[in-house]
Amino acid sequence: MQLDDDLEFAKKIFNPNRAFAKQARIKNMCEYKDLVHEANENYENFWGELAKQKLTWFKPFDKVLNSDNAPFFKWFENGKINVSYNCIDRHLKDKKNKVAIIFEGEMGDYNAITYRKLHSEVNKTANLLKNEFNIKKGDRVIIYMPMIAESVYMMLACTRIGAIHSIVFAGFSPEALRDRINDAQAKLVITADGTFRKGKPYMLKPALDKALANNTCPSVEKTLIVIRNAKEIDYVRGRDFVYNEMVNYQSDKCEPEMMDSEDPLFLLYTSGSTGKPKGVQHSSAGYLLWAQMTMEWVFDIRDNDNFWCTADIGWITGHTYVVYGPLACGATTLILEGTMSYPDYGRWWRMIEEYRVDKFYTSPTAIRMLHAKGENEPSKYNLDSLKVLGTVGEPINPTAWKWFYEKIGNSQCSIVDTWWQTETGGHIISPLPGATPIRASCATLPLPGIHAEVLNEDGSKTKPGEQGFLCITKPWPSMIRNIWGDEKRYIDSYFSQIQLNGEYVYLSGDGAIVDENGYITIIGRTDDIVNVSGHRIGTAEVESAISKHEMVVECAVVGIPDTIKGEGLFAFVVLCDGAKCNLGESLELLKEMNHILAVEIGKIAKLDNVMYVPGLPKTRSGKIMRRILKSIVKKEPITQDLSTLEDVNVVKEIINIAQMEE
C-alpha cells in the first residue's frame, strides 16, 4: 500500500506561526542554536544548571554525570528528591485550586481534580499501600489499570513512598501480564474490576485471576481492586481487597520518601527482538527533568494551557506526557476513558472544543483512522483553541500530516513530529513550535543537549540522503538505566554494535536519513520489531505464539505497510508434513492463529495476512533472512546476498507462491 502518497506536499517548508513564535520560550532558530552551542561548550554545566533550576531538591547533587561505569551512567549523583513532591506539593503554594486532571469517562461522567485534591488522594493511597499492603521503598507494584484518575493516584502514590511501579497495558493478555509480574517479582498487583469501552463494560479482573491462577506468580501477596464499572467479579479471600472501601480510612498526610537521584522510578516492559519483554528501568531525577524540559520546549507549555495527550498510561507516552511531564510543570492534563469512535468519530474534536485544549498530542495511526472514518467531523467543531499539534509513536505519512495540519490546526499550528522511545524517556528529535521550520513527515532536529546522529556500521557519519543507523552518541539524563535484572541484555541491546571514537554509542534500532540541513527523517525499524499503531511488537514473540498451533512447524513474521496502522503483521508459515490448505482452511487457520496471539500477547498483535510456504530462507547457521521475506512482500527485487543460504531454491518457491497469489 502507498503510504507516502503526497510527496510534492512533503517537500514544502512551513514556518512557525509568527504570533505564536513571539511569545514562545524558544522564539527562533538563533535561540535554538544558542542553546545547542551552550550544551556543546559545557555539557555537564548545561544539564546541571537545568536540574538546579527546574527541580526541587531535598539535598543538592554533588556531581552532574558519572561515566566511570559506562554505559551504566549516573546523573545528579547523591542528590535527594521525590517525584511526587515535584509533581504535586511544590505547586500547592500558588496552584492548589488549579485543575491538575480533567477526567472524562466513556459514559459521559466527568471529574475535575485540583492539585489540592490530587495531593489528598495520592497521600491517602500512599498510606493505604504502606499501612495495609506493607509496600516499602524498592518494592515493585504492577498497575494493570484503565484510563481513569485512580491510575494516576496509584502511580504517584508509589513514587511518594519509593515503590517502583510497572504499568501493564490493560489490553494485554493474562499470559503477558503474568510474564511481567514474574520478571519484576511484584509484591502487589493493582487493577480495576473493569472499565467501559464502546459504551459497554470491559472487564479486567478476570484477566488478573487467570494470570495468578495455580500460584504461577508466587511473589504476589495481595491484589488491590478499584471498582469502576461495578460488574460482578470473583474475589479470592485473603488476596483481593477493594480500594474504594479502604482508602477513605487513610490519612491524607504522607511525608514523601527521600529518594536518591538514581533510585528506580518505574519499570516499563517493551518488546524485545528475542521474544522476552524487556523491563526498561528509568531513574527518578533524570527522567523527571527531561519530562519537564520537553513539555516546556516542545509543547511550549503555559500556566493556563489545557494539555491533552491521547496515549494510554500503559505506554511510555502516557507516563511522560499524560502524567509526569504535565504535572511536573503544574499544567492541566486530560484523561479520556474509552475509544475515539464512541459514540461517534467526533468525540475527540468535541472534547477539544469543550475543554478548550491548547496543545494536542496523538499518534499517526489515530490521525489516519479519524481521517478515513470521519474526514468531515472536525468541521462541526470549534478547534481554534489549538496552538500546537504533536505526533508520536511512528513516522507519519504526508497525507495524514497534511489533513492534521490543515483541518485540525487550520494551517496555523506547528506540528511537532516527535521521535523518541521507551528507552529515551522523553523526546529526542523534534521541531520547536516557535522556532523550527517544519516539513511533513520529518522529525527535524535533535533537541538542545541531545547528540543524535545517523551513522554507518563502522561509526562514520552517513552522507546527506543516505540511510543509516540512528544513534545517540552522548548520555542524557532521561536515558534507560538498565534492563531489569539483566545487565548483559542492556549492553547487548543498546551498547554493543556501533562505536564512535572507540566507545560504544546508544543504538536506537531505527533507521534514518539526514539531509544537507541536518534534518532527520525516521525510516523505521532496522531490527526485528514491528511498529503496529505506535506499539512496538517483537516478531520473535509473535512467531513463538503462532508456533504453538499444532499445524505450524515454523514461521517468520515481518512488518508490512498499512495505511491506517502504519505497519501490519505478515506471516510466512510452514505447516506440518502432509498438511494441505485450501482457501477456507487458510482463513480458518488465520483465525485460529490470531486467537492464539490474542491470548498470548493481546489483541494488538493480529496477523493481517499469511502465506503458507514449503520452507523459510535460512543461513547455514539457521538464521532466518527476514530482509528477503520483506522484499518479497513489498514486491521488490531480491538484492540480498543469497550465497549464505542453506537452500536458495526456497526463495524461488516463495516468490512463485507470491506471484500466484497476486
Curated annotation (Swiss-Prot):
N6-acetyllysine sites (modified residues): 623
Lineage: superkingdom: Bacteria
Matches recorded under PANTHER family: ACETYL-COENZYME A SYNTHETASE (PTHR24095), ACETYL-COENZYME A SYNTHETASE 1 (PTHR24095:SF14)
GO molecular function: acetate-CoA ligase activity; AMP binding; ATP binding; metal ion binding
Keywords for this protein: Acetylation, ATP-binding, Ligase, Magnesium, Metal-binding, Nucleotide-binding
EC number: 6.2.1.1
InterPro entries registered for this protein in UniProt: Ac_CoA_lig, ACAS_N, AMP-bd_C, AMP-bd_C_sf, AMP-binding_CS, AMP-dep_synth/lig_dom, ANL_N_sf
Binding sites annotated in the UniProt record for Mg(2+): 549, 552
Transmembrane segments: none
Cofactor: Mg(2+)
Protein name per UniProt: Acetyl-coenzyme A synthetase
Sequence positions that bind ATP: 393-395, 417-422, 510, 525, 536
UniProt-annotated binding residues for CoA: 197-200, 317, 533
Gene for this chain: acsA
Reaction equation(s) it catalyzes: acetate + ATP + CoA = acetyl-CoA + AMP + diphosphate
GO cellular component labels: cytosol
Family membership: Belongs to the ATP-dependent AMP-binding enzyme family.
Short name of one Pfam family: ACAS_N
Disulphide bond pairs: none
Function: Catalyzes the conversion of acetate into acetyl-CoA (AcCoA), an essential intermediate at the junction of anabolic and catabolic pathways. AcsA undergoes a two-step reaction. In the first half reaction, AcsA combines acetate with ATP to form acetyl-adenylate (AcAMP) intermediate. In the second half reaction, it can then transfer the acetyl group from AcAMP to the sulfhydryl group of CoA, forming the product AcCoA.
Gene3D superfamilies: 3.30.300.30, N-terminal domain of ligase-like
